[in-house]
Amino acid sequence: MGIKGLTGLLSENAPKCMKDHEMKTLFGRKVAIDASMSIYQFLIAVRQQDGQMLMNESGDVTSHLMGFFYRTIRMVDHGIKPCYIFDGKPPELKGSVLAKRFARREEAKEGEEEAKETGTAEDVDKLARRQVRVTREHNEECKKLLSLMGIPVVTAPGEAEAQCAELARAGKVYAAGSEDMDTLTFNSPILLRHLTFSEAKKMPISEIHLDVALRDLEMSMDQFIELCILLGCDYLEPCKGIGPKTALKLMREHGTLGKVVEHIRGKMAEKAEEIKAAADEEAEAEAEAEKYDSDPESEEGGETMINSDGEEVPAPSKLKSPKKKAPAKKKKVASSGMQIPEFWPWEEAKQLFMKPDVVNGDDLVLEWKQPDTEGLVEFLCRDKGFNEDRVRAGAAKLSKMLAAKQQGRLDGFFTVKPKEPAAKDTGKGKGKATKGEKRKAEEKGSAKKKSKN
């Protein structure tokens, strides 16, 4: 999920931090890519025409391998040096989110069975994609493939995005590559999105600079992390009634998430009192109305009357007309508004962003090697049923690009200096000389010197 609504918030409030460009502009760059996100993306996107995942004759899924092989070659072909970071053990705080994802997959599975009988092919395909789950086998197969391709692979002790951010901060790579916006929350200086998208989508690479975002939002990194938590992250239950605009407004008004939480909990208490008072008033009104809702009473009269036969008979009882029930007036109560879950350990979530479980970037060595062509043919063609000619052609392209000495980037040789502001002229009136007057004075001075000589 990443951070809910962060992309829109930045595009609206800090647009200068985001820029789109073609992949070829990243030539010569090293990028740490969130492999776990990429596997999930490939399993969903790389499919047959009927919407089913790619499989070999044995029924083994190969969508993830197809995606990694060809899209990595595409990046290398544009002069990019990718390395892939895989997830380790998720933090305990993420357990509830993972449990909900599992529940959603089960719901989608049940829905798919029903859609097969009553729904359209589009409904079935949509529900099938919601059931995608990355397994340990998927991870191991991708690691094996990338190693055979000569691409560096790192297994993070914790979150892959956090390790990508660490490598970017350490200067081992230019940027972190992921679709999850929480990569910025993990303090990655630069985030690249859409790197592993299909070329057919024609999606430009989105480059986001954290320092520019912080500058334009007028926030410290500490405040930015707290803003992201308030927006909604993978570690906590989302807060109801708080969208991106409200979250930013609250952080700007109160300064810290602690004060925001205190403010919202105060509002929640006021709302609870208001609802209770309205309920008490309604109950009182209903009790009052019950007095008018009793059975009609009869009046026994002692009078008599003469009937048509001239006989004296008792007069009928006089009935009281029933009184109408007084309608109970209901007090209007405003909607519940902003709500924070009762158990919402945001301080723990903040620590996971500030001090994630990662390997120090300086301790990691990233090495790009020549691909093992025969190993690729054995694994992809013999085991997984890939076309051998295509695999050999891809390996040859990979070998050529990794062996070639990459052209240096111009921005590596030159430093662009900011333009110095023009000196302010404080001269006034006659004392202020123009450029033309200065030049004439200099010419006169030089003429006098020549005449003396």
UniProtKB/Swiss-Prot annotation:
Residues 320-333 have a biased composition (Basic residues). Residues 417-446 have a biased composition (Basic and acidic residues). Its EC number is 3.1.-.-. Residues 1-105 are annotated as: N-domain. Mg(2+) 1 binds at D34, D87, E159, E161. GO terms for molecular function: 5'-3' exonuclease activity; 5'-flap endonuclease activity; DNA binding; magnesium ion binding. Keywords: DNA damage, DNA repair, DNA replication, Endonuclease, Exonuclease, Hydrolase, Magnesium, Metal-binding, Mitochondrion, Nuclease, Nucleus, Phosphoprotein. Its cofactor is Mg(2+). GO terms for biological process: base-excision repair; DNA replication, removal of RNA primer; double-strand break repair via nonhomologous end joining; gene conversion at mating-type locus; maintenance of DNA trinucleotide repeats. DNA binds at R47, R71, E159, G232, D234. It is an enzyme of class 3 (hydrolase). Structure-specific nuclease with 5'-flap endonuclease and 5'-3' exonuclease activities involved in DNA replication and repair. During DNA replication, cleaves the 5'-overhanging flap structure that is generated by displacement synthesis when DNA polymerase encounters the 5'-end of a downstream Okazaki fragment. It enters the flap from the 5'-end and then tracks to cleave the flap base, leaving a nick for ligation. Also involved in the long patch base excision repair (LP-BER) pathway, by cleaving within the apurinic/apyrimidinic (AP) site-terminated flap. Interacts with PCNA. Three molecules of FEN1 bind to one PCNA trimer with each molecule binding to one PCNA monomer. PCNA stimulates the nuclease activity without altering cleavage specificity. This is Flap endonuclease 1. It comes from Cryptococcus neoformans var. neoformans serotype D (strain JEC21 / ATCC MYA-565).
